[in-house]
């Protein structure tokens, strides 16, 4: 029963009895006396509230007897019309009492007896409201209303003065409350500003703390807005001309669009390559009208200069945009991201990685790809397959178009797919690396690599035994597995000839790719590797191998031509099947992941010195990371701006050295003054100069470490191994152990990708 309801009932009944009190003044005093007694009884009851339910019943009986006495005293003096009012009040009181008794009875039936609370007692006497501490109304107008209600008395001068004083106090209290509220409001606003990032962190989905879905099930609900298509082609201005054989020629819109793709790349090395030019011209002619085909027969006679200059000017104009123009573009992009860049997966908002469909253009490929220069066609809604859940709203295609297909497959992770025209491969729109699906896949990958740790010795013993096998196929497989384990080579995939660049992996090594040296640079049994690896990046390495491996390689190369396969009895299918037999889920990539992660962990233990400062520890980490990148052949060409950035860094180092020399001279001078003066002021100056020297020494060391790091990493790509092959928990544990801020190792994107590892890893984690 609510406190307001009890209060109202007691108020009505009190007013009702007040009318009789004017007629019976003597009885009024008696009632007041009884009221005080009752109040005392109630306070005692409250103190004894921890006693048994039987005591509660006794107190209620006494309470009811008092009520009967009161009713008898009042009824003898009342008029007939007031009897009816009183009967109504009685019925109301009985209902209240009945509800209170029922509650107590219910508690008894449930097998427990709770101590009586004032909140649960029926307000039978009608003279006062229940005390503040027991009844908690939702809202009360002011503090004074919470005091016990007292029967009305005939007003006297003292009462009037008291009331006036209370009103004044109340006004003062209200003013104070208003001021406090304003302060609280301001404080709350400032707190909200401070706490905003925390709130965002709290909202991050900690999927790693939840139970995983059954094997094969990727999601239960998926809804998204579909892809964003490339904008339609905008024809060139009239002033931008295309020339063929020295004459102006107006191209049809389709032919002009493809011509602009070549014009944009005119200064690039690609446009000088014969295969690129040949493929481009062939596909461009397909887009021409018959008249254009008859005229344009030789690419060398085409002049794209004005087109190229127009796009350069456009690029320069974008760079010279005002802040307002740049802000407007940024806002438009953010609006697009907000609408299309997120999906709802299992009641969580997940970021989409690539929601924009790639615009049409010319295919470049990796390395010397045989299809470079071919036209990548514009993708239309009719090429698109949408994947979402059955109960989700299917995204609407652009007006006048329709989707190729809508699927509801929760065993795949892609949202949108289409087939590109160059290689016939399927392209996908997937979730961001920070999503649950990608995070779970990463976690599983590193856990599989950790499982390999338990059986790697057994596998190594097995392939060593197989080096002596009578079967040539088994020997070749064992040597290939040794290279995958020791050198982190890729197993390779089956390729169609002429479809891709001539890149080589372990199973596709040819005789021409290795040289055997019984002795080289003071080492025995050295194998020299030289072949184009993934993305046509050269793999060059001189590795000392075990004697039996060297002898087997000599055997495999017997009576073979340079272009013949080294492992002629082996392919990736045979090797991968063998790996699966050794351990469930084992692939060449698992070996690379295992060797990369274990190398990082070992290198960090060797290189990290406990007494080093943070910049020195970061240098140690990068050196450990570099060892992994070299193992995995993660190379890169030195950045174009490398020399310039190194010169700038060296200038900073030289300037810092000059500052340090000046600071040391100042310190020496201050020490000399302190010896002569011998006062507190000069001592303070010396301390200040000392701190300045220390600060400059630290700054100089940071710059020198940075220069060393850049020089060592100019041709090594650390990011590839950090993102794809190194268990992030090794890095997180190292950071926590040595007090290195995780922000110094992982950037914002990487921290989002590895949020699961950052949250769950302690400093004592071992791979």
From Swiss-Prot:
Region of interest called Interaction with DNA, as start-end residue ranges on this chain: 427-428, 490-495, 587-589
Gene3D superfamilies membership: 1.10.132.10, DNA Topoisomerase I, domain 2, Topoisomerase I, Chain A, domain 3, Yeast DNA topoisomerase - domain 1
Crosslinked positions (Glycyl lysine isopeptide (Lys-Gly) (interchain with G-Cter in SUMO)): 105, 119, 155
UniProt cross-link Glycyl lysine isopeptide (Lys-Gly) (interchain with G-Cter in SUMO1), position: 119
One matching Pfam family: Topoisom_I_N
Modified residues (N-acetylserine): 2
Site (Interaction with DNA) location in chain: 318, 366, 414, 445, 503, 534, 576, 634, 652
A GO term, aspect molecular function: DNA binding
Gene Ontology CC annotations of this record: chromosome; nucleolus; nucleoplasm; nucleus
Biased composition (Basic residues): 24-39
Modified residues (Phosphoserine): 2, 10, 59, 114, 508
Entry's localization field: Nucleus, Nucleolus; Nucleus, Nucleoplasm
Entry keyword annotation includes Isomerase: yes
Post-translational modification: Sumoylated. Lys-119 is the main site of sumoylation. Sumoylation plays a role in partitioning TOP1 between nucleoli and nucleoplasm. Levels are dramatically increased on camptothecin (CPT) treatment. Phosphorylation at Ser-508 by CK2 increases binding to supercoiled DNA and sensitivity to camptothecin.
Annotated family: Belongs to the type IB topoisomerase family.
More about this protein: Eukaryotic topoisomerase I and II can relax both negative and positive supercoils, whereas prokaryotic enzymes relax only negative supercoils.
Function recorded in the entry: Releases the supercoiling and torsional tension of DNA introduced during the DNA replication and transcription by transiently cleaving and rejoining one strand of the DNA duplex. Introduces a single-strand break via transesterification at a target site in duplex DNA. The scissile phosphodiester is attacked by the catalytic tyrosine of the enzyme, resulting in the formation of a DNA-(3'-phosphotyrosyl)-enzyme intermediate and the expulsion of a 5'-OH DNA strand. The free DNA strand then rotates around the intact phosphodiester bond on the opposing strand, thus removing DNA supercoils.
Protein name: DNA topoisomerase 1
Organism: Cricetulus griseus (Chinese hamster)
Gene, per the UniProt record: TOP1
């Amino acid at each position: 029963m609510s406190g307001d309801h009890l209060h109202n009932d007691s108020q009505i009944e009190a007013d009702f009895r007040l009318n009789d009190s004017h007629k019976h003044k003597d009885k009024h005093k008696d009632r007041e006396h009884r009221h005080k007694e009752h109040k005392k009884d109630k306070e005692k009851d409250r103190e004894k509230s921890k006693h048994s339910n039987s005591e509660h019943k006794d107190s209620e009986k006494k309470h009811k007897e008092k009520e009967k006495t009161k009713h008898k005293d009042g009824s003898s003096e009342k008029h007939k019309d007031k009897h009816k009012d009183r009967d109504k009040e009685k019925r109301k009181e009985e209902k209240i009492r009945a509800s209170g008794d029922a509650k107590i009875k219910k508690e008894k039936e449930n097998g427990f007896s709770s101590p009586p609370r004032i909140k649960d007692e029926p307000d039978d006497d009608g003279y006062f409201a229940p005390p503040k501490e027991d009844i908690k109304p939702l809202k009360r107008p002011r503090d004074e209303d919470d005091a016990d209600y007292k029967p009305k008395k005939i007003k006297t001068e003292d009462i009037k003065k008291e009331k006036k004083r209370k009103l004044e106090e109340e006004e003062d209290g209200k003013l104070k409350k208003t001021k406090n509220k304003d302060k609280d409001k301001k404080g709350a606003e400032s707190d909200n500003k401070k706490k905003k990032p925390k709130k965002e962190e709290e909202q991050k989905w900690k999927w790693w703390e939840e139970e995983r879905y059954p094997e094969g099930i990727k999601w239960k609900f998926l809804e998204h807005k579909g892809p964003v298509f490339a904008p339609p082609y905008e024809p060139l201005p009239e002033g931008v001309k295309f020339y063929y054989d020295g004459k102006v020629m107006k191209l049809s819109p389709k032919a002009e669009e493809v011509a602009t793709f070549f014009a944009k790349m005119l200064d690039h090395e690609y446009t000088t390559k014969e295969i690129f030019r040949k493929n481009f011209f062939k596909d461009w002619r397909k887009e021409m009208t018959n008249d254009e085909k008859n005229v344009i027969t030789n690419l060398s006679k085409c002049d794209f200069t004005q087109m190229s200059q127009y796009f350069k000017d456009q690029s320069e104009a974008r760079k010279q945009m005002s802040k307002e123009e740049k802000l407007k573009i940024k806002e438009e992009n953010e609006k697009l991201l907000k609408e299309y860049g997120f999906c709802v997966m299992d009641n969580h908002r997940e970021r989409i990685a690539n929601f924009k469909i790639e615009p049409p253009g010319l295919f470049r490929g990796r390395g010397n790809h045989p299809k470079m220069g071919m036209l990548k066609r514009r993708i239309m809604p009719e090429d698109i397959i949408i994947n979402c859940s059955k109960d989700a709203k299917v995204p609407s295609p652009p007006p006048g178009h329709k989707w190729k297909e809508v699927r509801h497959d929760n065993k795949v992770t892609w949202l949108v797919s289409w087939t590109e025209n160059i290689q016939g491969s399927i392209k996908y729109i997937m979730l961001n690396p920070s999503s649950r699906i990608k995070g779970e896949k990463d976690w599983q990958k590193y856990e599989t690599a950790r499982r390999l740790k338990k059986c790697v010795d057994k596998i190594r013993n097995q392939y060593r035994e197989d080096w002596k096998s009578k079967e040539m196929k088994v020997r070749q497989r064992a040597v290939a597995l040794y290279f995958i384990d020791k050198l982190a080579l890729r197993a390779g995939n089956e390729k169609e000839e002429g479809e891709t660049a001539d890149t080589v992996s372990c199973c596709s090594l040819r005789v021409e790719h290795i040289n055997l040296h019984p002795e080289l640079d003071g080492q025995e049994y050295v194998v020299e590797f030289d072949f184009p690896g993934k993305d046509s990046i050269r793999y060059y390495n001189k590795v000392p191998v075990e004697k039996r491996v060297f002898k087997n390689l000599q055997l495999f190369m017997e009576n073979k031509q340079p272009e013949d396969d080294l492992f002629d009895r082996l392919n990736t299918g045979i090797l991968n099947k063998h790996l699966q037999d050794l351990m469930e889920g084992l692939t060449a990539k698992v070996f690379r992941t295992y060797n990369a992660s274990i190398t990082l962990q070992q290198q960090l233990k060797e290189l990290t010195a406990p007494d080093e400062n943070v910049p020195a520890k970061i240098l140690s980490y990068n050196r450990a990371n570099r060892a992994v990148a070299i193992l995995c052949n993660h190379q890169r060409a030195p950045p174009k701006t490398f020399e310039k950035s190194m010169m700038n860094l060296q200038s900073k180092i030289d300037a810092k050295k000059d500052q340090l020399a000046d600071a040391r001279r100042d310190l020496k001078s201050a020490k000399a003054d302190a010896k002569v003066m011998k006062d507190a002021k000069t001592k303070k100056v010396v301390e200040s100069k000392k701190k300045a020297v220390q600060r400059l020494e630290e700054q100089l060391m940071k710059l020198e470490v940075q220069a060393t790091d850049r020089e060592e990493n100019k041709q090594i790509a650390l990011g590839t191994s950090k993102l794809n092959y190194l268990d992030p928990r090794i890095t997180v544990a190292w950071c926590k152990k040595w007090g290195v801020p995780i922000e110094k190792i992982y950037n914002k994107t990487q921290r989002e990708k590895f949020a699961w590892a950052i949250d769950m890893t302690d400093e004592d984690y071992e791979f």
